[in-house]
Amino acid sequence: MQIDADIAMQKPFNILKKETHYYAVTEDEPLENNTYLSYNKVVGTALDKKLYLAMQILDYVLVMAPGAKLKQALIDKGIGTDIYSSLESSVLQPVYSIVAKNAEESQKKAFVDTIEEVLRDIAKNGIDKRMALAGMNYYEFKFREADYGAYPKGLMYYLTMMDSWLYDENEPFIHVEALDTFAQLRKELDEGLFEELIQKYLLDNSHGSLIALVPKRGLEEEKAAEEAKRLETYKNSLSKEELEAIVADTAALKAYQDEPSPQEELERIPMLKLSDIEREPAKLYIDKKSIADVDVIHHNLFTNQIAYLMLAFDCKKVPDELLPYVGLLSSVLGLMDTHKHTYPELTNEININSGGIATDAAIYTDSKDFSKYTVMYEVKGKVLYEKLPFVLEMMHEIIYETKFEDEKRLREIIARIKSRMESNMTGSGHTVAMLSAMAQFSPSSYYSDILRGYQYYEFIEKADRDFDSMKEMLAENLKRTAALIFTKENLTVSFTAGDDGLELLQKPMTEFVAKLAQLQEKDAVRTFRPVKEKTAYTSSSQVQYVARCGNYRKAGYEYTGALKVLKIIFSYDYLWLNVRVKGGAYGCMSGFYRNGDTYMVSYRDPNLAETNTIFEQAAEYVRRFDVSERDMVKFIIGTIGGMDTPMNPASKGVRSFGAYICHTEYAQLKKEREEVLNATKESIRALAPLIETAVSQDYLCVVGNNAKIRENEQMFEKIEPLFL
């Protein structure tokens, strides 16, 4: 059979299409400054390999880079508080979009006029070549490094190949053989390439649209009423026999969902044997050195002359009331002016000379004494060996010379954080629900919540709302927090490279340490004050995220590797069948940590009380767990698959440093792996009391639809809007 799989080209529009659509908000959410404006243009085809990369670099210059000209022009005119972009390059006719969030519908004309004014200026007067060069280096470094985290490189290369191969069977490699294209782009940077692209694809191109997405209260109820009316009309049009057939089909579907697949069919699927699996866990690379009296944890690995450097500063001197500022620092450092560079200049220098510098806050729990945890502020960079002096110089400038008193820039950053957090909470409510529930009993989760969770959102929302009255305090507290963190006493270094890289680190690290501040300050006293409240956060979402949490160690139970197997069993059997297949949720997850913290959570779930009941019955399922020997082996193999995800040198270094900070010994990892490989039905059933203990503690948090939560309000002690 010959199938015509060709995708037809869409005809271009004669003029820019303009449309207005609506999205639902609750009564608690504002209508003002809550519109999305999107400017969209079709740009060539996915088979143009030069355009494929050039548009990514152009996007970097226009919107993505800190201080990008087009983004800054929109923000300066008050058209949205968060400007972002997207390049959909995996379709035959790629689409480039510029989006203003938190705008007004009345700003549509100003939005388009500002975009086109900036584009005309760049097309006429030239692109910022240094920023374009930074963008090229940023993407080329990423391409050469090919760091895809836990995803196999082969898979990611294949997905890139599909961006062209889908549309021309003779062109599978044009986007994975990109080095020549990067070289060509560097050559044409001074020949007007990007100015021509702006003129051709963004200014003179009518194949585009302007979309306004406007908030509307009551829209969800309108749609629900329309759907109910449509279904009622359809039902009334059916005969008695047709109605009975639908009932019978539904019953048949439920029976099919409950019926296991025939064993003979399952056994046709090839499967590994346990004897095929390596019994030793992955090696830890921990070689403790000292440079200028600072501990340097060397992860001795071949990195192809790329050094992965992390400066980890213990936040032990930061008092509880300043911990939210530790989270804020990670969004401020590197994105504000310093005494030597404006923040766009700083970004250009970093991306031209390195693979980037990033900062973040992290929490490590001791693997032997679970009452101990460490809050660390991490400054990370990746560079070629010869650029180590440069990256340390930039790190010093960022942590010591940032101008926190720049009120305009600080306001922009806080508004952007708020916007991004609200977007993330909408699509990832399960993380909000899980962390909020666990923060009620787990110290490490409590402080994670302060640094990046809902408590941090509350801090950011207040800082955004009351910025004018708080701005001096915000700047002063950022300075104070930085001073308490960035000292020699607090520093431990993680360094992933070969011995030759370590040798090249000695001199610049010695010079860096010599310039570190020394501060005589007592360690802060942490005060964990948990408040147990069954909480629901309401939004206009049509789905729920239901989290049920607890801690099995509180009843004296110990961690075992069999819990890792149970996680897989839940993911592919109990929770999968009940929450996803029968319940209709998009996903379900669980976790059992070494410190006893336990969670079960649903993802994009149409249900609420029903899912909570499924979580409550989990211990009984474990108590009665019974599968064939073959299925037990499958669960073990699935567990090992999660433990043995591909790791590049950078990932191995991160894992090893985490083990060092948490005092995790190789023997612990080996014991855990043996417990996984030796897991049996009996060892799984023995976990029932652990699950029962955790669930019975009754820590519940739900993020979801306002009406659905109100229907089940008796389940909660506190109900609040998700967005403040």
Describe the role of every protein-language-model region:
Residues 19-24, 180-181, 191-200, 293-296, ...:
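Short alpha-helical segments and helix-capping/turn motifs at coil-helix boundaries
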Residues 183, 196-284, 422, 435-539, ...:
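Long, compositionally biased intrinsically disordered regions
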Residues 52-57, 113, 226-232, 396-397, ...:
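Short intrinsically disordered coil segments
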Residues 34-44, 71-186, 206-216, 222, ...:
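M16 family metallopeptidases and their MPP-like homologs
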Residues 4-67, 152-171, 175, 237-334, ...:
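His/Glu-based metal-binding/catalytic segments typifying zinc-dependent metallopeptidases
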Residues 2-3, 404:
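Bacterial peptidoglycan biogenesis and beta-lactam-recognition machinery
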